[in-house]
């Protein structure tokens, strides 16, 4: 019976096969809503990243055969973290569009002074904005947004393979999301803004008509 002999290259390949995808997934979880806030412990995020890595491992494909302690390995690690953080910011910007819409509605309604602490970012936000954020989070989970996120992660390893340089198209796509965020916020807030503006116009018009009568009495 022959003994099992493992070479250094094979061990390094096994380590890289799971470690580099985990860095990308952990970068995503550190920024995205729900998981990226301070209320979720770091150990929980790392454990969840390890679990998701095991689930997606069959779909990741081959990774470069690089020594984990080399400079090339450090560059690949930094690249994976950067990709994960960028993906997390894309998801975060979608939720920020909802927050921005809530702030616009609160200011229009005159409720901008009613503030509460946002546990996600640790800042004071209008209550209406926080309500919108909670509803967006519940809709995200109810509509299986977390399933779509797993599909996005799996697809990212095909579009942006581990170890390959980032193309200009991928970076430009992420940058274009800034404009999409503001347009999305306007689309979400527009019905409430139009309603409040109509109420304000009617109120001002009614006050303008009744004030002369009051002063003449």
What are these regions (language model features)?
Residues 1-209, 213-216:
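Hydrophobic alpha-helical segments and their helix-loop boundaries in membrane
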């Amino acid at each position: 019976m022959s003994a099992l002999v493992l070479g250094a290259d094979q061990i390094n390949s096994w380590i890289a096969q799971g470690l580099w995808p985990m860095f990308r997934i952990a970068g995503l979880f550190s920024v995205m809503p729900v998981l990226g806030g301070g209320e979720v412990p770091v150990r929980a995020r790392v454990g969840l990243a390890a679990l998701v890595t095991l689930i997606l491992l069959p779909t990741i494909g081959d990774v470069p055969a690089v020594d984990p302690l080399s400079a090339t390995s450090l560059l690949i690690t930094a690249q994976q973290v950067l990709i994960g953080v960028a993906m997390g910011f894309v998801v975060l910007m979608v939720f920020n569009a909802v927050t921005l819409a809530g702030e616009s509605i609160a200011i229009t309604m005159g409720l901008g002074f009613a503030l509460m602490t946002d546990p996600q970012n640790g800042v004071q936000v209008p209550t209406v904005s926080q309500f919108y954020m909670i509803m967006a989070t519940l809709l995200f989970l109810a509509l299986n947004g977390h399933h779509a996120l797993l599909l996005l992660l799996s697809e990212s390893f095909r579009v942006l393979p581990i170890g390959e340089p980032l193309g200009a198209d991928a970076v430009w796509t992420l940058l274009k999301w800034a404009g999409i965020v503001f347009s999305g916020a306007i689309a979400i807030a527009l019905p409430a803004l139009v309603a409040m503006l109509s109420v304000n116009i009617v109120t001002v018009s009614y006050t303008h008509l009744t004030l002369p009568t009051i002063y003449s009495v």
